[in-house]
């Protein structure tokens, strides 16, 4: 055989340029790029070196022959003309892979059969024996690629694809192939940063692919050094002495690299199910001293290298599957950008994404972008320098999803209308309440509170402030009240509110509050889709003032949510009838070990998912769409802290029967208490004004009414807004 060969290296689409540069550095000459491949010329030593050292290639193919063909007979004759006794024992095993079509070959399976027949017939006619087919681990794997009438016949020197390094036996739901991860690291400048002694951190590391590939680059470890079976292992053209030379050189370089002080390489992953698989992958790669993986949310990401060195933050955020919708994904990118700006000053950052438009929501300018493909999905690698001059001013406004409202300075009317005497009295009451409650709200870090609740009988309204928006609920007037007078007073109030509070009339939202039947309480009232971000006790929550009767945040339960935040540390939290899971967000903020939230409404669970994502909390917080009673009957888990705030009345196509809180609360609480761990606490609350707790519950459990403790100053005037109890096992 010749001492010089044509080699054909395949790779993921988009890596051709990087692979060409890498292959030249490893000795490949006359390099030319093709779609998802490169080709060049090399001796056998270089071919071996490419196999063991290429971080980017999928396969290294040694071209045996190129020939023209017009039909299947030409294909057979071209393959049969090769002296296969130089490559494969007559009683050996082979596999054939065929790609392309044309020249009478429109079926790759048929093409592969013709190639196989040509090889088998050649050896049988010469040796009297024939090789057998072995698809998994053959002695020789033959490739034939048909391209515009030209057949390229090759031997696969690599065997299994080179991206399969052998360390990643456990992986997450959407893994990044190892050679693609290496390409992203190279494009991100990691070889340069590593050579300078820099650090690397991945805030969403999954099972650690970026971390292991980064450590192998930094420690000068050949990616396929540990591979035991190669495509050339049983090939008759194999030169074992030459291979041992190449392998021994790689082994020596790895030993020297691992003898150096390890770089600081850390990964953080929110999903506890991926932590141990990631650590196992690191150990299989022999990099336990270099790479550490911890459980952590994006919202708390803060790399702290031992020597305070800077480096590279690299991440492959989910493309939508893990979090469920685009809005949740947007908040994830927003959180990532916030953490980079707050905790990674002076670092470089690289975000590999299938949703590049979300990179613009991070509040940092990307100074370089590279196109990649992750399988069939077009992706972008966004590179950032985390420096103040790269920060985008006003990024909070940019980070809102389409249709989301942001705070603005309200336009002032040029000349306010004169108020009636009654309206002026109403305005004066609003201003008095604002002065009293505003100081309290600012001190408690509260954006939303009840400013007025039918304080004056003739103005039967609830007025809630949501930052610089006003949510007004009109209580239905009794039949004894003249409808015209009631309407006039409502119009007076609506005229007074903007003047009294100094906000635009366009920021006043009016709804009518009356007794609801069935599921009407939860039905959509409008379709504006305007979400607003508010703050409460250190957490961010989304409210929608227009589309539903309720806004997504029950203001009267604020003290209960704050109590849950204070008590949640290290506990398993269960939220039943969770609505938009605002209490769950508080529990996560308080350090809950895990949270589970159950509700029948997909709409509100999607909202809950956004609330969690907005705060950087992800899928360790379980959201279950189910009828609560049925879910409790089928659940066998234990919880340390349970919160139940059921509706007064509920029915749905998805549930059997009708839920009535007065009738069904005993069964509900018995089922929930069966899930309460020893020493745990269950909080039960509801808004039914005539509700009476069944006395038998007080005999079975330790029950304490805590209603007075769950009312903040803004609801002190209406101590019947809800009732609340604390229950424990006796």
UniProtKB/Swiss-Prot annotation:
It is an enzyme of class 2 (transferase). It comes from the Bacteria. Its main location: cytoplasm. PANTHER family: RIBOSOMAL RNA LARGE SUBUNIT METHYLTRANSFERASE K/L (PTHR47313), RIBOSOMAL RNA LARGE SUBUNIT METHYLTRANSFERASE K_L (PTHR47313:SF1). Keywords: Cytoplasm, Methyltransferase, RNA-binding, rRNA processing, S-adenosyl-L-methionine, Transferase. One of its GO terms (molecular function) is rRNA (guanine-N7-)-methyltransferase activity. Residues 46-157 form the THUMP domain. Its EC number is 2.1.1.173, 2.1.1.264. It is found in: Cytoplasm. Specifically methylates the guanine in position 2445 (m2G2445) and the guanine in position 2069 (m7G2069) of 23S rRNA. It catalyses: guanosine(2445) in 23S rRNA + S-adenosyl-L-methionine = N(2)-methylguanosine(2445) in 23S rRNA + S-adenosyl-L-homocysteine + H(+); guanosine(2069) in 23S rRNA + S-adenosyl-L-methionine = N(2)-methylguanosine(2069) in 23S rRNA + S-adenosyl-L-homocysteine + H(+). Belongs to the methyltransferase superfamily. RlmKL family. GO terms for cellular component: cytoplasm. Residues 395-418 are annotated as: Disordered. This is Ribosomal RNA large subunit methyltransferase K/L. It holds the Pfam family THUMP. InterPro entries: 23SrRNA_methyltr_KL, DNA_methylase_N6_adenine_CS, RlmKL-like_Mtase, RlmL_1st, SAM-dep_methyl-trfase, SAM-dependent_MTases_sf, THUMP_dom.
